[in-house]
């Protein structure tokens, strides 16, 4: 069993499944589906000026492989946005500071953040040293972790164990998605 997480930054995706769920994932929305013991599911992009999003597949622990399937529609207005000097953080799953996202991950404790940093901004996040953490740079460029090299858009970076994640931008801003679990 797996969970699929479809996060749509911009666009429109029509979806449906064998449980009778259906609808549209729209700008800033997320669909969190647990396949578990089995579900038929389809997604079809709809005509829109720009389509930008991603899908993450989460492998369920052995003991949860055959849980009943379930579906959660997290519309963009249900995803809290934390605004700080130089940053805007969308909390899709898990916590950022005192702000909780609409899901924590039922089977795999998950943090999923949509982070936008202005030029010259810094971002720090305490992390679980046992978690796997990676980012995907959506737009712009920045420095992540202790890397000297600037990472630009359309790149993913996997990080080793640690107690804190750090990011900073130069003269350009950056938008990245952060996943930990």
Language-model features: where?
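Jelly-roll (double-stranded beta-helix
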Residues: 1-181
